[in-house]
Amino acid sequence: MSKSARGWSDGFDPVYPYDADNDRPCPSSTLPSFSSDGFQEKPLGVLSLGPGRPCHTKNGEITLKLGEGVDLDDSGKLIANTVNKAIAPLSFFQQHHFPLTWIPLYTPKMENYPYKFLPPLSILKSTILNTLVSAFGSGLGLSGSALAVQLASPLTFDDKGNIKITLNRGLHVTTGDAIESNISWAKGIKFEDGAIATNIGKGSRFGTSSTETGVNNAYPIQVKLGSGLSFDSTGAIMAGNKDYDKLTLWTTPDPSPNCQILAENDAKLTLCLTMCDSQILATVSVLVVRSGNLNPITGTVSSAQVFLRFDANGVLLTEHSTSKKYWGYKQGDSIDGTPYTNAVGFMPNSTAYPKTQSSTTKNNIVGQVYMNGDVSKPMLLTITLNGTDDTTSAYSMSFSYTWTNGSYIGATFGANSYTFSYIAQQ
């Protein structure tokens, strides 16, 4: 018996081929054959898709499981949605870029970027790129690709990268982290007002004039000299002082008239007193320079006298023969510009030559001189020490020249130099 083909209706379902209402009951619930690639029987008797991670079904639709930072945009495209965090000076800008936020002052601005820079930062423009650079001045430089401090000797770096000064002999670092000089206290070096100084002792001093051109107070160390000592042209110590001699009182060699014999300032007296321990070595001469009875000598004149009187301090009294402005301590060929106030050491000793008006043997020094140095014209010179009882003077000396009356008529009075000595007061 042949079987005829069965016709299929339009609503025939090959998975569930039998209509539960019209056909006979299905003899078996076993599903037709299917591939396990992408399919599964879940629940039992139901054929369904088997999605793997990250797919899953949601509201009857297959969709993707989205984790943190991933999302779908309005068109259904998968996008990243990362939540970024920034702390000042970082901030977010367009297209999720984060620039540095700088102090809002006017500075060069990088084109197309919201950067503002304060010096030393700036933009180095080129045809290819605009490069952020840092400007630096003296003392800084590049070492490889790093900014570094440039050091010159004696500066260097220690093992920890700190700047230090290389110290040599004569310098050290104190406990207070200060650089200090090493000095030899035992060799005459000391600190004075924060500076190194020479510790000079007795007999030494600093000079009064600078020895270095253009340097103030560059004074040399000198031997400290007492009264009566000086340096000669070779720098050796010598007795006396050729520039400022406090061992010599004199009238100077100036030819100007300085004393009175018969009239005011009619003669030039040259008198030099030099202290030699307890003795005074003296030289005297006199010359009339103005017209009068001594220039020329008249027949009525046979003597000439010069008087010098001093107070208790040995200061010359001006109301007597010699002008005070031509009398003082020797300084070169002149006298010290500052009037002296004490010269008792040059005065005739008041014990050896007591003050008296009468002529005594011990008060007088007698010698012979010559008229204008002519040995054929002798004169008698009498030097009297402290030979006055004048209450205004404590010490005195006078020079009395005498000759035979009528001997030198017509000549100008002048007496050659005469040297003598006497005992000093001190």
Curated annotation (Swiss-Prot):
Induction: Expressed in the late phase of the viral replicative cycle. InterPro entries: Adeno_fibre, Adeno_fibre_knob, Adenobir_fibre_prot_rpt/shaft, Adenovirus_pIV-like_att, Attachment_protein_shaft_sf. GO terms for biological process: adhesion receptor-mediated virion attachment to host cell; cell adhesion; symbiont entry into host cell. It comes from the Viruses. This is Fiber protein. All late proteins expressed from the major late promoter are produced by alternative splicing and alternative polyadenylation of the same gene giving rise to non-overlapping ORFs. A leader sequence is present in the N-terminus of all these mRNAs and is recognized by the viral shutoff protein to provide expression although conventional translation via ribosome scanning from the cap has been shut off in the host cell. Transmembrane segments: none annotated. Homotrimer. Interacts with host receptor CXCAR. Interacts (via N-terminal tail region) with pentons. The keyword NAD does not apply. Keywords: Capsid protein, Host nucleus, Host-virus interaction, Late protein, Viral attachment to host adhesion receptor, Viral attachment to host cell, Virion, Virus entry into host cell. Gene3D superfamilies: Adenovirus pIV-related, attachment domain, reovirus attachment protein sigma1, domain 1. GO terms for cellular component: host cell nucleus; viral capsid. It comes from Human adenovirus E serotype 4 (HAdV-4). Belongs to the adenoviridae fiber family. Pfam families: Adeno_knob, Adeno_shaft. The tail region anchors the fiber to penton base capsomers, whereas the shaft, built from several repeated motifs, allows the knob to protrude from the virion. Its main location: virion. It is found in: Virion; Host nucleus.
